[in-house]
Curated annotation (Swiss-Prot):
Protein keywords: Glycosyltransferase, Metal-binding, Queuosine biosynthesis, Transferase, tRNA processing, Zinc
Protein's organism: Pseudomonas aeruginosa (strain ATCC 15692 / DSM 22644 / CIP 104116 / JCM 14847 / LMG 12228 / 1C / PRS 101 / PAO1)
Listed name of the protein: Queuine tRNA-ribosyltransferase
Free-text cofactor note: Binds 1 zinc ion per subunit.
EC number: 2.4.2.29
Taxonomic placement: Bacteria, Pseudomonadati, Pseudomonadota, Gammaproteobacteria, Pseudomonadales
An example Gene Ontology molecular-function term: tRNA-guanosine(34) queuine transglycosylase activity
Length: 372
């Protein structure tokens, strides 16, 4: 992987990631393909909406169908017929999400499989081996996602464990040609975040992610971390904010120097009839749309907006037709890609402030302040 920083506007960065499988323009949003599929989307649909990289889930693919099945096809790209780059998360967040079903020790995590209840163990070495088998273009270290809230002592122990696991992940990654990203932890504590960052830089990674956000903390806390952390991260490596978020969150992350994002929100909300447009969110199942023959978003160039009315989308949603979820997903993911394309162009042109002001004005919101 090669990362080029092409332009800056304030803290915001316009860059380019180059892989053997393709180029990713940054800032970038990565659709989430948990089980080797972006729900409701054919691979050609993902290309059509402008996504250049997607995310796969190490934990779930390891448990089902398993790496042996996937490797019979070659790797995850071949299995799901996606030609572009794939980032795989390490499984750490999913293990964290199991709560009482898992036991964390120095060696790794033992847990009951959510598939069949069997006792399963995963540590840094296992995570790296699975991601290598998947043929990931970007591999994430195995870490512990610090819970929220966590006092200083709890967050410190968690962060230090993640650093030890980061070293083991780097060793286990070995001579793999895939990029390896570290993950900054430390909860909401600035000193721990900076110690985590220093430790990861000593180990050496191809890129760095910000983990442990969007885990239940108030948005103000997330913004506070994003105000102080990205400026401390190396300028010559990509910065990835994990699991975030709404379009507004992407804009605020980019304003603070983040390059990469992923989130299930656009796909999950699409299946629930919540559709993102420039003015905010349209709840397509509401009865007000039953007789509305207008397009969902006249500014959008997606297949859904080019061909179907709000009334038709409302009808599909009320009937529970799978086509409704598919068309909604196409639109939501295209909306996210359009936001990212607008951010990239604005940074390139040095007009980010105007873009952000217009973005919020369309939503009837004031532009949030930005620390210098």
């Amino acid at each position: 992987m090669n990362f080029e920083l092409l332009a800056t506007d304030g803290k915001a960065r316009r860059g380019r990631l180059t892989f053997p499988r393709g180029v990713v323009e940054t800032p970038a949003f990565m659709p989430v393909g948990t089980y080797g599929t972006v729900k409701g989307m054919l691979p050609r649909d993902i290309e059509d909406i402008g996504a250049q990289i997607i995310l796969g889930n190490t934990f779930h693919l390891w448990l089902r169908p398993g790496t042996e099945v996937i490797q019979r096809h070659g790797d995850l790209h071949d299995f799901m017929q996606w030609k572009g780059p794939i980032l795989t998360d390490s499984g750490g967040f999913q293990v964290f999400s199991l709560g009482a079903m898992r036991k964390i020790k120095e060696e790794g995590v033992t847990f009951a499989s959510p598939v069949d209840g069997a006792k399963v163990f995963m540590g840094p070495e296992e995570s790296m081996a699975v991601q290598r088998a998947l043929g990931s273009d970007i591999v994430m270290i195995f870490d512990e996602c610090t819970p929220y809230p966590a006092d200083h002592d709890v967050a410190k122990r968690s962060m230090e464990l993640s650093l030890r696991w980061a070293k083991r992940s780097k060793i286990a990654h070995g001579d793999s040609p895939s990029a390896l990203f570290g993950i900054v932890q430390g909860g909401m504590h600035e000193d721990l975040r900076l110690r985590s960052l220093d430790g990861l830089q000593e180990i050496g990674f191809d890129g760095l992610a910000i983990g442990g956000l969007s885990v239940g903390e108030p948005k103000e806390e997330m913004i506070r971390v994003l105000d102080f952390l990205p400026p401390q991260m190396p300028a010559d490596k990509p910065r990835y904010l994990m699991g975030v978020g709404k379009p507004e969150d992407l804009v605020e992350g980019v304003r603070r120097g983040v390059d990469m994002f992923d989130c299930v929100m656009p796909t999950r909300n699409a299946r629930n009839g919540h559709l993102f447009v420039d003015s905010g969110v349209i709840k397509i199942r509401n009865s007000v749309h039953k007789h509305d023959d207008s397009t969902l978003d006249p500014t959008c160039d997606c297949y859904t907006c080019k061909h179907f009315s709000r009334a038709y989308l409302h009808h599909l949603d009320k009937c529970g037709e799978m086509l409704g979820s598919m068309l909604n997903t196409i639109h939501n993911l295209r909306h996210y890609q359009r936001v990212m394309a607008g951010l990239r162009e604005a940074i390139q042109q040095g007009t980010l402030a105007a873009f952000v002001d217009a973005f919020y004005a369309k939503r009837g919101l004031p532009t949030p302040p930005l620390d210098a």
